[in-house]
C-alpha cells in the first residue's frame, strides 16, 4: 500500500503561476508530512544544524545544514523531513513551476 502524500513543507507563504514559496519549521523531534518533490526547487536554510530525510524504503540520511546556505535541488525525491537535533530547523523552499 502506497503512503499518502502531504505538502512539501509546513506552510505555503506565496503562490503564483511561476513559483510556490513554502516555510518548513520543525521543532526538535518534529517531522514533516511524507511528501514528493514534483518540481525543481531552491532551499534557503535559515536555522538549524542538521535535518534527516527518511525515505519510504526505510533508509535515512542526516544532512548537516548551515544557516544562510542556498541549494538548488532537482525534483523526484519522496521523503519525510525529521528534526532529530536539539535546535529548531527552519528553511524556505521555493518550488519553480517554470513558464
Locate each region found by the language model:
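Ligand-binding loop in jelly-roll beta-barrel domains
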Residues: 75-99
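A short glycine-rich, His/Asp/Glu-containing loop-to-beta-strand
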Residues: 6-33, 40-43, 94
Amino acid at each position: 500500500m502506497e503512503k499518502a502524500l502531504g505538502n512539501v513543507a509546513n506552510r505555503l507563504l506565496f503562490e503564483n503561476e511561476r513559483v510556490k514559496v513554502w516555510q518548513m519549521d520543525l521543532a526538535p523531534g518534529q517531522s514533516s508530512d511524507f511528501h514528493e518533490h514534483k518540481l525543481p526547487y531552491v532551499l534557503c536554510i535559515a536555522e538549524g544544524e542538521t535535518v534527516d530525510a527518511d525515505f519510504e524504503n526505510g533508509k535515512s540520511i542526516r544532512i548537516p545544514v548551515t544557516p544562510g546556505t542556498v541549494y538548488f535541488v532537482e525534483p523526484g525525491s519522496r521523503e519525510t523531513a525529521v528534526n532529530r537535533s536539539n535546535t529548531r530547523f527552519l528553511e524556505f523552499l521555493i518550488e519553480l513551476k517554470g513558464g
